Amino acid sequence: MIRLETILTPGRSLVNVPGGSKKRALEKVATVIADQVPELEMQDVFEKLVAREKLGSTGFGNGIAIPHCRLEGSSAPVSALLHLEAPID
């Protein structure tokens, strides 16, 4: 059984993160994940997130989005939770 605390760890849960733009926010997500998950490369995570976003926005409005993608190098689900200083639409 996969447990939530292995998918979303305290090290991948950040608040008051500077965002500025969608691209910068995705870069930050990719950096946080790659820093915490050694088998994943930041650039690969970032490129996959951007490619997924090009298929259609993962934003819900009101500053909420759930960017996601599939990563070949990941053997288990991985997530990060970032609360930005200011919402991005």
Curated annotation (Swiss-Prot):
The keyword Ion transport does not apply. PROSITE patterns: PTS_EIIA_TYPE_2, PTS_EIIA_TYPE_2_HIS. The keyword Aminoacyl-tRNA synthetase does not apply. One of its GO terms (cellular component) is cytoplasm. It is found in: Cytoplasm. Keywords: Cytoplasm, Kinase, Transferase. Residues 6-89 form the PTS EIIA type-2 domain. Seems to have a role in regulating nitrogen assimilation. This is Nitrogen regulatory protein. It comes from Pseudomonas putida.
